[in-house]
């Protein structure tokens, strides 16, 4: 009888070269001596799931047929039973490997992280496994959906969809039970939001919105600890941001966001926040100003001689927010750095490179880290939303263009000879300034979509680029709008199935506000 087959324990390079390895770690001496790259001892893991195309004798089962009236056909015979979905081993080890493959394929390489490390919601997922059957199912559906899309595996995608629907049923049962909900339920709603970004369900964009609003509906039912864990902090940050996206789209104040911000500060025992948190807090203030300005403008036709003081206060609030945005950006740049224009030989896919190369915008930006890029994108997106409000208030209050000037913005890149000063017309026209910052977001696309950025960089682009595209569309900047549409189509190949649905997405409230402004000259206050 033969013994156990020999299995080499050497490094991957020596195994491939079929030579004896001295097994020194982390790199073997033989590879170093002979000038080879030692690829280490970690074996490549391959996940194999059975499909209906490969059925062995073990899947032949007895199936009882209805009794025949003639009695000639036996009522019991072997029947081939086709599995409707792949059978995937979901034991703890395989589940953790599947999740690790998803996280590794979604997050960027360490060179794009601040100081080689950054807190991210996905990094906390492995530690959450095994504590909640609901959350485990949601995480497995998310991981398998991403990997299925990456490898074009329809069977695995079908498995993911079934698991997703099963998780939804479990969650709805927990909510309807009337009992207190744990943090795992809140986390699951956020996981579902990520799932919709990767593999959008038939309702499309509105399925993502439904999960955002579902999170908002249950947050007060979920138990809150006195001191947040890192995972709780990152999940709450994600929930705050998507709540803001929904609120800005509906042109309503993000009321829940204020509760979350207060909870976070109380749990930290400090009012000091990270730069991205400060900027999203200011975006929340902007969402409230949108609603207040809309109400003020809409009341003008019924009351042409409306209270000018209310309009003046709103204008003052907008300009105050603008100044605080610039100051926050300056503090952020002290910590994270400023953009530069030295982006050369960026590793991009050819179809991506062909579309992004354009003369519509100045040179593309380079950032010190993805956190630096994300913070600037939120800063610019907030200004795109804010400046049209200022222009509209100036119109209805009867101000001339030069009566109010914007405050000094922070530099987009270090003050060198390359620094471009804005044209005089732009610095005295708030809507033109908004277009300038929409351009800045477009200049960031190449950095966020380079090959080793994986999917996270593209995810950070979704909301800001959507604001730019909406601005270009309603202000009829056709070429720039078509360029943004092309980017959204390409983002699908980076793992964001929702992106193509955003290429034609203009919130109805945003379009009606633009139409209202074109008619606002008839409703000036005196």
Regions from the PLM with identified roles:
Residues 18, 80-92, 116-118, 215, ...:
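C-terminal region signature
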Residues 1-133, 160, 173:
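Charge-rich, intrinsically disordered regulatory segments
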Residues 405-478:
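C-terminal hydrophobic structural anchor segments
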Residues 27, 132, 156, 181-184, ...:
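Helix-start/N-cap signature of alpha-helical segments
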Residues 107-111, 201-409, 428-439:
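Central/C-terminal regulatory/activation regions of fungal transcription factors
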Residues 126, 140-153, 162-204, 214-221, ...:
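Hydrophobic/aromatic-rich effector regions of fungal transcription factors
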Residues 24-27, 135, 156, 160-163, ...:
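Alpha-helical interaction elements in eukaryotic regulators
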Residues 26, 35-37, 448, 492-496:
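Intrinsically disordered, low-complexity transactivation/modulatory regions
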């Amino acid at each position: 009888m033969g013994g156990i087959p020999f299995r080499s324990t050497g490094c991957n390079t020596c195994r491939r070269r079929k030579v004896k390895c001295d097994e020194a770690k982390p790199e073997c001496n033989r590879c170093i001596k002979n000038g080879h790259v030692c690829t280490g001892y970690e074996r490549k893991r391959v996940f194999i799931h059975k499909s209906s195309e490969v059925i062995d004798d073990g899947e032949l089962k007895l199936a009882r047929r209805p009794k025949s009236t003639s009695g000639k056909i036996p009522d019991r015979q072997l029947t081939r039973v086709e599995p409707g979905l792949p059978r995937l081993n979901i034991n703890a080890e395989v589940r953790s490997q599947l999740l690790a493959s998803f996280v590794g394929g979604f997050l960027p390489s360490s060179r794009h992280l601040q100081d080689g490390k950054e807190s991210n919601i996905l990094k906390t997922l492995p530690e959450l496994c095994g504590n909640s059957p609901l959350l485990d199912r949601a995480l497995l559906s998310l991981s398998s959906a991403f990997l299925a899309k990456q490898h074009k595996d329809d069977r695995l995608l079908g498995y993911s969809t079934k698991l997703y629907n099963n998780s939804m049923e479990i969650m709805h049962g927990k909510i309807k039970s009337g009992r207190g909900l744990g943090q795992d339920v809140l986390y699951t709603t956020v996981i579902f939001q990520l799932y919709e970004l990767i593999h959008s369900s038939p309702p499309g964009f509105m399925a993502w919105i439904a999960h955002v609003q579902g999170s908002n509906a249950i947050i007060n039912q979920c138990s809150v600890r006195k001191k947040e864990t890192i995972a709780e902090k990152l999940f709450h940050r994600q929930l705050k941001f998507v709540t803001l996206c929904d609120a800005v789209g509906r042109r309503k104040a993000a009321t829940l966001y204020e509760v979350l911000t207060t909870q976070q500060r109380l749990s930290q025992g400090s009012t000091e926040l990270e730069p991205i948190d400060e900027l999203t807090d200011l975006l929340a203030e902007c969402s409230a100003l949108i609603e207040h300005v809309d109400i003020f403008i809409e009341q003008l036709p019924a009351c042409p001689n409306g209270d000018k003081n209310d309009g003046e206060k709103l204008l003052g609030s907008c300009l105050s927010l603008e100044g605080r945005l610039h100051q926050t950006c300056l503090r952020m740049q002290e910590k994270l750095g400023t953009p530069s224009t030295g982006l050369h030989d960026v590793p991009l896919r050819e179809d991506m490179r062909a579309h992004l190369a354009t003369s519509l915008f100045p040179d593309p930006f380079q950032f010190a880290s993805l956190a630096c890029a994300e913070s600037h994108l939120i800063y610019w997106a907030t200004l795109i939303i804010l400046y049209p409000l200022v222009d509209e208030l100036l119109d209805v209050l009867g101000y001339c263009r030069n009566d109010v000037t914007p405050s000094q913005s922070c530099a987009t890149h270090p003050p060198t000879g390359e620094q471009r000063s804005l044209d005089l017309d732009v610095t005295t026209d708030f809507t033109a300034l908004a277009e300038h910052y929409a351009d800045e977001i477009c200049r960031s696309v190449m950095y966020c979509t380079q090959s080793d950025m994986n999917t996270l960089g593209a995810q950070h682009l979704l909301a800001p680029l959507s604001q730019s595209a909406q601005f270009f569309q309603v202000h009829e900047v056709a070429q720039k709008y078509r360029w943004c549409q092309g980017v959204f189509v390409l983002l699908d190949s980076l793992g964001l199935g929702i992106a193509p649905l955003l290429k034609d997405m203009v919130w109805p409230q945003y379009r009606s506000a633009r139409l209202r402004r074109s008619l606002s000259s008839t409703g000036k206050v005196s």
